[in-house]
Every structure is written in C-alpha cells, then in structure tokens.
Regions:
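TRNA-recognition modules of translation machinery and tRNA-sensing kinases, especially anticodon-binding
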Residues: 1-170
C-alpha cells in the first residue's frame, strides 16, 4: 500500500520551512547560493513538501510513501571520534516512510511505521532495541519519536539505524 518515490534532491527555503524547523538542520545542510536551494538532509522533507499547498480530501487519505534518495550533510566529524566513518559522512542513501493521514489516525499509523521498521530488522536477524526518545531530544516538529538502535559487535555498542516520528499537524 506504499508508493515508491524518488524525491527531489534539492528544496527551496520556503518548502523547507514548511516541513521542519530549519534551525534543526541549517547548520548541517549544504546551501546552493545564490539560488536559495538546499541539498536534502533527509528524504522525508521533500516527500512531505511534495504535498505543499495541496488540498487533500479525507477520502483520499491515507497517502503512504516510501522514499529512497541520497542525502547530504556537512556534519562529518562534528560528533566526536567515535562517530567517524559510515555514521558521519557527507553523502548517504536513506529509505524513509511517510504517511499523510487524518489527525485522529496518526497514532495508529505511527505504530504501523514502527512495525514496518521492526519487521525489516527482524527479517535480517539482527539484534536491535527500540528507544522511546524523550521530548527534550526530539526537536520541535515531532510529537513522539522512537529510534531503533542496532547492536554492532565490532563497536561493542548500539547505534541508531531508524527513527520513527509522529509529526501530528506540524
């Protein structure tokens, strides 16, 4: 029931301001001057922005999308030596799930998104844990956020591999 989407890799400032608190990402995003565009930091931003200024009839909901795209961030090395390498690189590919739904259905779909992520990791046979992120760490956009952290035996620690947020009416 999901539509596969290859989202745009650039967004203008107006579109970005409509889908996130730009201050959460602006310091790690690549800006393209003088055009006022940004390379995307994560693919759920353009997936959501694609619906900007659209009037969606309730009968057409939910809209379920999966986006696959390269993402770009300037945060390499910004989080200390233990986060170098694959975890903090300038370009990486992500798969994102986005559901646009009726407000009263958002919590059920949030559970569905989390279940999809857990099913994927279960199918890989990898050990992970689900972390319920405290409100002080989820930023202004999300109402609730879960992370899946996979156990990396070589590193001897869990690392975040999935985030699953309910942004309610942001």
């Amino acid at each position: 029931g999901y539509t596969l989407v290859q989202p745009p890799l650039m967004m203008n400032r107006k579109a970005y301001e409509g889908v996130t608190d730009l201050s959460d990402f602006e310091t790690v995003m690549y800006g393209i001057e003088p055009d006022g565009y940004y390379l995307i930091a994560t693919s759920e931003h353009p997936l959501t922005a694609m619906m900007m200024d659209e009037v969606i009839e309730p009968a057409n909901l939910p809209i379920k999308m999966v986006g696959v795209s390269p993402c770009f961030r300037r945060e390499v090395g910004a989080h200390g030596m233990s986060d170098r390498g694959i975890w903090r690189v300038h370009q990486f590919t992500k798969v994102e799930q986005v559901i646009i739904c009726k407000p009263e259905e958002s919590w059920g779909y949030h559970t569905e998104l989390l279940g999809n992520a857990k099913d994927l990791w279960d199918s890989l046979g990898l050990h992970y844990r689900v972390v319920d992120i405290c409100t002080g760490d989820i930023g202004t956009v999300a109402s609730r956020k879960y992370d899946l952290e996979a156990w990396l035996p070589g590193a001897g620690e869990f690392k975040e591999v999935v985030s699953c947020s309910n942004c309610t009416d942001y």
